């Protein structure tokens, strides 16, 4: 099974205040922030602060000892954030074009996971609302998610689809996570020594 979680960054510039934003969206963002599901922007004018997003992300990776195998993103308004990741991390970054030809397969994969019950999630109001607000639309190329109404928020669903752009191949033999070289590069020193002694490494055949 797959498991998904989200963390949203909440701007309030257009609404005028976070209180107005909560009333407009019908979501108690202060309560959800206390539960760890979102961060209300600290920007004095209510704009998203890329530095705040960047620091949160790196802290999350470090605090949870994550080995990032793929970072897919919508290139729109992400240049500063991605440049910081490129300069300071070795994460594999990939811009994903937000068009049907690119998104139809991960969209179908995610839809199938939910239908078959092969995905779990935390009881998180932001993700729940995004999933409810998202609808599948089809054209002559394939399927893609869209908003039920223009004012609805589905950013979390868009992010999940971007993540599954590569993740849907994770258990295939050709996936990067199944590449022996990649495995060694992402092992601890102890794990590397164990791997070198393992017949499956193929290195023992040379001696």
Stretches with model-predicted labels:
Residues 1-98, 108, 125-207:
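RNase H-like, metal-dependent nuclease domains and their acidic two-metal-ion catalytic environment used
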Residues 95-122:
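Short alpha-helix plus adjacent loop in nuclease-associated cores
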